[in-house]
Amino acid sequence: MSRIGKQPIAVPSGVTVNTQSGVFKVKGPKGELTVPFNPDLTIREDNGQLLVERPSDRQEHRALHGLTRTLVANAVKGVSDGFVINLELRGVGYRAKLNGKALELTIGYSHPVVIDPPAGVTFAVPEPTKIDVSGIDKQLVGQVAANVREVRKPDAYHGKGVRFVGQQIALKAGKAGATGGKGKK
């Protein structure tokens, strides 16, 4: 048995689930999500918990067991609590602001970079150097946060750029560290 696949998924109050052939629908206070899954697997509700079961120990079923359980758990958590990814800007003059729903970044280019959020994702700027990307779909929130970071990845020499909060950047030594001091070649 898959260690992840056999774990039950707790369904919080206020969340309704519906399973039809190959489609799992979950509705909660934050919204509604649909997760397609392999119809060979079964998702059943038992005492306020969801269980994902596989019909056999074939390689295909074993591979899909843990994946399906994780996708369903993320959907349940998304409609009840939601997901937030925090980003921070490092660099002199780097700042972010909201322009309507769009995120406007001033990050060292000759022009501000404007990023429109896709449906289901919202931006928040609690401070000029902090960005919160939030939504109910974990994959979409992560992809949008990665796209924002991609606009100006952290520099390897100074650490300037857009990074995830808590992300450690291994800085390179630079010219002085590479030659061993002044004047030596």
Curated annotation (Swiss-Prot):
Gene Ontology CC: one annotated term: cytosolic large ribosomal subunit
One GO-annotated biological process of the protein: cytoplasmic translation
SUPFAM superfamilies per record: Ribosomal protein L6
Top-level taxon in the UniProt lineage: Bacteria
UniProt-recorded Gene Ontology molecular function terms: rRNA binding; structural constituent of ribosome
Keyword presence, Ribosomal protein: yes
Disulphide bridges: none
InterPro entries: Ribosomal_uL6-like (IPR000702), Ribosomal_uL6-like_a/b-dom_sf (IPR036789), Ribosomal_uL6_a/b-dom (IPR020040), Ribosomal_uL6_bac-type (IPR019906)
Alphabetically ordered keywords of this record: Ribonucleoprotein, Ribosomal protein, RNA-binding, rRNA-binding
Function recorded in the entry: This protein binds to the 23S rRNA, and is important in its secondary structure. It is located near the subunit interface in the base of the L7/L12 stalk, and near the tRNA binding site of the peptidyltransferase center.
Family the entry assigns: Belongs to the universal ribosomal protein uL6 family.
Assembly description: Part of the 50S ribosomal subunit.
Name assigned to this protein: Large ribosomal subunit protein uL6
Native species: Deinococcus deserti (strain DSM 17065 / CIP 109153 / LMG 22923 / VCD115)
Lineage start: Bacteria, Thermotogati, Deinococcota, Deinococci, Deinococcales
